[in-house]
């Protein structure tokens, strides 16, 4: 079993409060879950209303499949209309 993880850092220029941030983050997480079948959570910068750090995970039987799915998530976020893409870290591990 392979677990792929993706950590994405986004800048939310239009966010004026944590409430604004939560609304944007919720929409991003829901869309990525629905489109790519990944698990999603906000994992860092929880109190900063301008920055969102999101974690995504996928379980697969092949490293290449897990990596492909997460790269598609990253690509989708790079073109998000509200959030500016700041960077990502992609990793995978084998679990016996």
Predicted regions and their residues:
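N-terminal first-folded block
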Residues: 1-39, 76
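Short, charge-patterned binding micro-sites
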Residues: 3, 41-62, 94-95
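A structural signal for short, well-ordered beta-strand segments
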Residues: 6-10, 54-56, 88-92
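Short beta-strand elements
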Residues: 36-43, 84-90
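C-terminal structural segments of small proteins and small subunits
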Residues: 60-96
């Amino acid at each position: 079993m392979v677990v792929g993880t993706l950590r994405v850092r986004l800048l939310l220029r239009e966010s004026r409060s944590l409430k604004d941030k939560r609304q944007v983050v919720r929409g991003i997480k829901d869309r990525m879950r629905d489109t790519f079948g990944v698990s999603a959570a906000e994992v860092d910068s929880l109190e900063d209303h301008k920055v969102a750090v999101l974690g995504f995970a996928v379980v697969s039987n092949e490293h290449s499949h897990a990596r492909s799915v997460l790269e598609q998530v990253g690509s989708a976020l790079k073109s998000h209309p509200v959030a500016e893409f700041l960077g990502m870290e992609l990793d995978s591990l084998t679990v016996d």
